Design a protein with these regions (language model features):
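N-terminal beta-alpha lobe that positions the nucleotide/phosphoryl donor
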Residues: 1-182, 191, 288-311, 506-509, ...
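N-terminal, non-catalytic alpha-helical interaction modules of very large eukaryotic scaffold proteins
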Residues: 341-713, 717, 728
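Cysteine-dependent phosphatase catalytic core of the protein tyrosine phosphatase
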Residues: 223, 298, 305-373, 550, ...
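Conserved phosphate/anionic-ligand binding catalytic regions in large, soluble enzymes, centered on
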Residues: 22-54, 116-147, 186-230, 317-339, ...
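Intrinsically disordered, low-complexity terminal tails and inter-domain linkers enriched
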Residues: 255-280, 918-936
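Extended active-site and interfacial segments that coordinate phosphate-rich ligands
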Residues: 133-166, 189-270, 331-387, 862-864, ...
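A structural-propensity feature for long, helix-poor, extended segments
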Residues: 47-95, 241-247, 252-255, 831, ...
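Acidic, glycine-rich flexible loop/linker segments
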Residues: 58-62, 302-305, 316-317, 325-341, ...
Length: 937
């Protein structure tokens, strides 16, 4: 089939339609758009997708492409085999005569002595969601007579192993993806490099980053030199930073005439014979290596071109540029796909705003689907409204990357609240605290307190009144319960107030008369006035416990091990009860050998029905689920199943206990912790008993320790009851999804998670669901793959503060020590707690931990987590079990591998990698993919 039957095989950049991705591919379309807008793009044309269709029009090739689409992304060997078959088929193909003539005719528009850049341009590359950088071929310095062959090679590179695997992982159809090819004369560049119109290291959309080197950009793209690196503020044109790199070589076009003199270097390698054009590598003189490539004025000019490209193409751009004859030209432009999305909606006041990740605060930083985000945004808004703070916050929450962020700008703009927030949040998540401190220190003008204006006075009066009305009724109960705790009359596990608290949360949803009303009630579930009046007094002794814990830590700063010990060994603690319950289940299985054998062989609960002793085990298991079946991993994400729905993780823990422990070991462990706590308390009392007032101090410390232990053990009880509410909300919303399935509005009940709140309400009121659920599922999957920052600004900057741990071993990872002690062992990296177990003696390495991870702590000897703080769940459990722990370790699950030996110091907050660590990406400097000798793009 001739290309002309479907469209021209060639489109020049200036021609209408060349900016169409379906015609010119991503790279070609972007260059055409820039050229048509008047930006400096070297003259060139695109061999279009019509030519690609001409090349692949063969039943054998189409069959192989369809076979690729039918394969699973995990079948890498089969994918590679079919891809190799396709490349072989394409290498034996030729363009039709009409297509070949069209391309060769276009080439006559250039000088015969020109050499060319031949760049692949797939229809699925250089898109906002998928860049395909480094997946397809690019050839530089190509002689005119070889262009046609290189075009065929570029089209065949659509099926390189890496390109096929990338499309398969990202759910992109191979049959729907086509290849165009960009043809341009090579630019004889004095300098070249890469411009990022947003800083890729921080995400700041108002800072551009430039890498620059002498000669062609190939040396930078290939990673062969350390380029100059500059940062420019695009609002003020200020050059914020210019670092001169060590540029040992330059790559230049091969010219017979005085090329060495122009570069003032020595030729060290010739990539192609002189008569074929091509490039060569030049070794630069010592002075040249250390000299600046670009002046400040040149930087500003280049950044201005980048801003125009970003505005035209609608997203921050990764631009390859060259400087020739004193003028900049743009060689390529594609979206920066690695940036974390900018928070939305933007601030209404036009000023800098700072947002804190709700997920990081809850030790659950993963993305959540749209409806779940709406639940928590509504919840936060209602809480602020009840406190009278809604007017002060504007949009109290924003979204970015499938996460909810809380606007803390109002706190940071107040001199007293600023320090209070930064100090208090340090115990929850140290990176958030240091991030807030860093942005306040770096941008003080944004957080200057401007006083209370006359116009704002009514708002302050209203806020004060609401706070008094909200907290006032709770004050007597708070005082009464704290005094009761101090007198030894603290809450007990049998106190019905705990279940009443859960009943309050659950009943506000389940008591509604209809499924529609119950779904709406989820978004109104917390009556904050009633919460403060009835619930806050019950949990107030917990604040006393935290205060006493802080006092003990400060007073006995030289005895951290003993202070940690008195905070564990509680049989009544929720976490301990969960683990004791799982251990008891293993003992039940041991008492029935056939059950134990079946479980070791991977039996499910249903499989045990006909096994001798199986019913006894099932009854015990159901008793456990009656108490804890509403728990699960990532509990604040209502879309995730609970243990009652999917008990496979619990059964895996029981299997591990059967394999690695004897009967009663789990209860012996708790008894040892109780004994350790009593011994530690005695030692702390002895430390206090010195001098004339020693006996009095001893009694005082004994009283404080008793009060601390009588109150701190119930720290997980509020979460236990809150999780009951979350499960009720989940059930109600899934029921609403089922209702919409019955009406033909949704395909599956869990599609409901991909609706927005207003869309759900409209559908329940009889409206039509006009939503692309599949697209939202794909967007959610992309969000899940992103690493979210704990602090982000309205400018898109991911703010990271520095934690000073003093001298640390080279290569050590630094985080926050939350449970003292040192342990050395093999790492077990787990990202999904439902699909893995920890073997005895291993150190658990996780992205985050919440109550759903609790069973995995049974066999662990230490914890490393990417997220968390001193009072996060993982820290509490680690201290309860006496495990050294370091949290808030950036990229821990990427930089540590399973089986690697590590040394964990929970006192200093460091993790030493004792085996050779895996290579990692340097966050401070982003490098482009390394290329083959002919270039890969």
């Amino acid at each position: 089939m001739s290309a002309n039957s479907n469209g021209s095989a060639v489109r020049w950049f200036h021609e209408r339609g060349a900016e169409n991705i379906g015609v010119a591919g991503g790279k070609g379309a972007n260059l055409a758009a820039l050229a048509r807008a008047g930006l400096p793009v070297p003259r060139g044309f695109v061999v279009t997708t019509a030519a690609y269709r001409d090349l692949v029009e063969s039943p054998q090739i189409r069959d192989a492409i369809n076979r690729l689409d039918a394969l699973d992304a995990a079948d890498t060997d089969v994918l590679a085999a079919v891809a190799a078959e396709l490349r072989s088929l394409l290498e034996s193909r030729e363009f039709s005569a009409s297509v070949e003539t069209t391309i060769t005719d276009a080439m006559t528009s250039f000088e015969s002595t020109d050499s060319f850049a031949v760049r692949s341009s797939a229809t699925a590359e250089d898109l906002p969601s998928a860049s395909f950088a480094g997946q397809h071929e690019t050839f530089l310095g190509v002689a005119s007579d070889d262009v046609l062959d290189r075009v065929c090679d570029c089209m065949a590179s659509l099926f390189t192993d890496r390109a096929v695997a990338y499309r398969a992982r990202n759910g992109i159809s191979h049959a729907d993806t086509e290849m165009a090819v960009v043809i341009q004369p090579m630019v004889d560049a004095a300098a070249a490099g890469v411009l990022f119109t947003a800083d890729p290291a921080t995400g700041n959309r108002h800072v551009s980053a430039v890498d620059a080197g002498f000669g062609l950009g190939e040396s930078i793209v290939a990673g062969d030199v350390t380029p100059d690196h500059a940062l420019v503020n695009t609002r003020t044109d200020e050059v914020l930073e210019y670092t001169v790199g060590t540029k040992t070589i330059a790559v230049e076009l091969h010219r017979d005439s005085a090329a060495g003199e122009r570069t003032r270097g020595r030729e060290i390698e010739e990539s192609q014979p002189a008569e074929a054009g091509g490039t060569r590598r030049i070794e630069l003189s010592a002075n040249r290596r250390e000299s600046r490539v670009l002046t400040d004025d040149q930087l500003r000019t280049l950044v201005g071109l980048g801003e125009r490209a970003e505005t035209l193409l609608g997203a921050p751009q990764d631009v390859e540029w060259a400087l020739t004859d004193g003028q900049f030209v743009l060689l390529q432009s594609r979206p920066i796909t690695s940036l974390f999305p900018r928070p939305s909606p933007p601030p209404v006041d036009g000023r800098l705003h700072v947002y804190v990740s709700m997920g990081h605060m809850q030790a659950m930083p993963e993305a959540m689907p749209p409806l779940v985000r709406d639940v928590w945004r509504t919840y936060t808004g209602n809480a602020l409204s009840s406190a009278g703070l809604d007017a002060s916050f504007g949009n109290p929450t924003v979204e970015a990357g499938g996460r909810v962020f809380i606007d803390v700008t109002s706190f940071l703009r107040h001199p007293k609240l600023q320090s209070w927030l930064i100090d208090r949040i340090a115990a929850i998540n140290e990176p958030i605290s240091t991030g807030l401190a860093a942005i306040v220190s770096r941008r003080p003008e944004e957080f200057a307190f401007r006083g209370v204006t006359v116009g704002a006075l009514p708002g302050y009066v209203e806020t004060t009144g609401r706070l008094v009305r909200l907290i006032g009724p709770a004050a007597p109960g708070i005082v009464r319960n704290i005094l009761g705790a101090l007198a030894g009359r603290g809450p007990t596990p049998d106190d019905e107030s705990w279940t009443r608290m859960g009943d309050l949360f659950v009943g506000q949803v389940t008591d509604a008369p209809t499924p529609e009303a119950r779904a709406r009630a989820v978004f109104e579930a917390i009556d904050f006035r009633r919460f403060f009046r009835d619930v806050y007094p019950r949990i107030s002794p917990l604040f006393l416990a935290f205060a006493l814990g802080g006092w003990l830590t400060r007073t006995f700063s030289e005895q951290p091990t003993d202070v940690n010990a008195i905070g564990r060994g509680f049989e009544r603690d929720v976490v301990t009860r969960i683990n004791l319950g799982l251990g008891d289940l293993a003992d039940v299985a041991r008492a029935h050998p056939q059950v134990a054998s079946a479980l070791r062989d991977g039996a499910s609960l249903a499989d045990l029905e006909d096994v001798d002793g199986g019913e006894t085990f099932r009854e015990a298991f159901n008793d456990f689920l009656d108490e804890f079946g509403h728990r699960g991993t990532g509990e604040i994400d209502l879309s995730r199943p609970r243990w009652r729905e999917d008990p496979s993780m619990l059964l895996a823990v029981v299997r591990a206990n059967l394999a690695n422990e004897a009967a009663g070991d789990h209860r012996d462990r708790i008894r040892r912790l109780v004994d350790d706590a009593e011994a530690a308390a005695a030692r702390l009392e002895a430390y206090a008993d010195h001098g004339l007032l020693g006996p009095l101090r001893r009694r005082y410390v004994r009283w404080l320790i008793r009060t601390y232990r009588d109150t701190v053990y119930f720290r997980e009880y509020p979460k236990q009851e809150a999780a009951r509410a979350f499960t009720a909300w989940r059930t109600v919303l899934l029921d609403a999804g089922g209702l919409l399935v019955d009406e033909g509005q949704l395909d599956r009940p869990d599609d409901v998670w991909y609706l927005r709140k207003d869309e759900l309400f409209d559908a329940l009121d009889g409206g039509c669901v006009d939503v692309d659920i599949a697209a939202r599922r794909q967007e959610h999957a992309r969000n899940v793959d992103m690493d979210a920052p704990p602090v982000v600004t309205s400018e898109g900057e991911a703010v990271r503060g520095q934690v000073d741990r003093g001298p640390v071993p080279e290569g050590a990872l630094v985080g926050t020590g939350v449970s003292s002690g040192v342990v050395e062992g093999a790492a077990r990296v787990i990202r999904d707690p439902t699909a893995a177990t920890v073997e005895p003696g291993e150190i658990l390495v996780a992205p985050s931990t919440d109550p759903g991870w609790t069973p995995l702590f049974l066999n662990a000897t230490g914890l490393v987590s990417e997220v968390g703080g001193a009072v996060s769940h993982g820290a509490l459990v680690a201290r309860e079990y006496g495990l050294p722990a370091v949290v808030s370790v950036p990229e821990a699950t990427k930089r540590i591998r399973t089986g690697q030996r590590i040394r964990l110091d929970g006192t200093r907050g460091t993790v030493d990698l004792l085996d050779e660590p895996l290579a990692t990406t340097d966050e401070a400097h982003v490098k482009r993919p390394k290329t083959d000798s002919h270039g890969v793009d």
